[in-house]
Design a protein with these regions (language model features):
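Short beta-strand segments
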Residues: 15-19, 79-83, 221
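Pre-Walker A-like glycine/lysine-rich segment at the N-terminus of P-loop NTPase domains
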Residues: 1-45
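Post-Walker A connector loop of ABC transporter nucleotide-binding domains
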Residues: 45-49, 259
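Conserved small/polar residues in nucleotide/adenosyl-binding loops
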Residues: 252-259
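Amphipathic alpha-helical domain-onset/packing element
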Residues: 196-225, 230-250
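An accessory alpha-helical subdomain
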Residues: 123-215
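Nucleotide-state sensing region of NTPase/ATPase domains
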Residues: 48-131, 140-143, 147, 204-209, ...
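Short, solvent-exposed loop/turn elements at beta->coil junctions and helix N-caps
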Residues: 57-61, 226, 251
Length: 262
């Protein structure tokens, strides 16, 4: 995949911008606060639907303007494509590839595979597990469409289970339906864990090779996933925590998506 050109209109500090990229490495340079990071952010946003800075869409639109537009011309498997993204202050963003609307973010992820390294990424090692989970989810969602499917379903079921825990306080007979949600939660949660473990193993091997070069083989680096839960053990542990879940009103204490890499 190659990005050939980028056009911006009313994005951040840009009234209009049109730039072509050369094959190979492209270097952006200039004075501070001139918009270099904004260019990278616009590409990342178009590929993932999210800003790496965590900004809301309205904050990406140039001051005193109501909407912004990003267009990317890219080549994939020898075929040219155009991605258009419209940002509006009071509406959800619109995305289309070759004029065909993209309705779900899951259909966009992986179309333009990107890896962004910014100062914010130091949170992966400096902050808690949530930042590492976020990194895993972004990378895996671009690489494995099935992972995104499993994660999306897991999160939906988790919300439903937590809502059920709240309802059980007022309708105790609903407790009989909890096991059905547990089975679904474990089904998708176990798959999420498997994908993450596989990714961490592969990433660990790559990191070890790079670290060997940097240290002359004198030091070792180890990446581990902190939980090894199979389907049966996950279901058993979830059942053990059921009373605790019920007492907390609407919270599932054993959550597959909150395991992490260390």
């Amino acid at each position: 995949m190659i990005i050939k050109s980028l056009e911006l209109k009313n994005y951040r500090n840009y009234d209009e911008l049109s730039m072509n990229f050369a094959s190979g490495t492209n270097l952006l340079y200039g004075d501070n606060a001139q918009g270099k990071t904004n260019i990278l952010e616009s590409i990342y946003l178009s590929a993932t639907t999210k800003s790496h800075r965590g900004n809301k869409d309205r904050e990406l639109i140039k001051f005193e303007e109501n909407e912004a537009h990003i267009r990317i011309h890219f080549e994939k498997q020898g075929i040219d494509h155009h991605l258009d993204m419209h940002l509006k202050k009071n509406k959800a963003k619109g995305v289309a590839i070759d004029r065909i609307p993209i309705r779900r973010s899951s259909d966009l992820l992986g179309q333009i595979p990107v890896i962004l390294f910014s100062p914010e990424d130091l949170k992966i090692v400096k902050s808690g597990p949530s930042e590492r989970r976020k990194f895993l989810d972004i990378e895996l969602s671009q690489m494995e469409r099935l992972y995104l499917y499993q994660l999306t379903n897991y999160n939906k079921i988790l919300v439903q289970r937590n809502n059920l825990l709240k309802q059980i306080r007022f309708q105790n007979n609903l407790i009989e339906t909890l096991e059905a949600w547990d089975i679904q939660l474990v089904k998708y949660g176990s798959e999420v864990i498997k994908y993450r473990e596989k990714f961490i193993k592969h990433l660990g091997k790559v990191c070890q090779k790079i670290h060997n070069k940097l240290t002359g083989g004198k030091e070792k680096i180890l990446l581990e996933y902190d939980r090894d839960v199979g389907y049966d053990s996950y279901l058993t542990e979830l059942a053990k925590k059921r009373q605790k879940d019920l007492k907390s009103v609407s919270y599932t204490h054993l959550r597959a998506h909150e395991t992490g890499a260390y």
